[in-house]
Amino acid sequence: MTETRYVTTPIYYVNDKPHVGHAYTSVAADVLARWWRLQGHEVFFLTGTDEHGQKVEKAARDAGMDPQAFTDKVSQHFRDLTGTLGLSNDDFIRTTEARHKAACSALWQELAKRDEIYLGHYEGWYAAVSYTHLTLPTICSV
């Protein structure tokens, strides 16, 4: 048996409906998953949605909806996209699902047990538009 391959798309932000960029990355991941399957590899292909963040909160507020109801609605568009494109994904995960929260909690606990989590110091600004943390040297170099 050959080694297992893991393929994932980005987990897409649900601040708006899918667009051609989402389709592009999804199809690219699907092509890779199918290619590896044709080569005899066991493949696990994951896609899904990231339902946290300031952009998502703002989009829900702008739509006049409860954040969970908003993410339920928009996430369904992404799930539908997998069928529309005929993707061969094995799973679709949402970051608001209990199984995702449980996995994150277990990972955190394991890292804490190994002393891999520590308090540090960070100074900078967060640009919600680009999901980027910026430091003063970065800003000054632009």
Question: Could you tell me what each predicted segment is?
Answer:
Residues 2-74, 91-109:
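N-terminal catalytic cores of NTP/NDP-binding nucleotidyl/phosphoryl-transfer enzymes
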Residues 42, 88, 117:
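Residue-level detector of anion-binding/catalytic polar loops
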Residues 78-88:
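A glycine-rich helix N-cap at a beta->alpha junction
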Residues 112:
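Basic phosphate/pyrophosphate-binding loop/patch that engages nucleotide-derived ligands
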Residues 116-123:
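Short, flexible, mixed-charge glycine/proline-rich loop motifs
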Residues 127:
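Short cysteine-rich clusters marking metal-coordination/redox-active sites
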Residues 132-138:
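Conserved small/polar residues in nucleotide/adenosyl-binding loops
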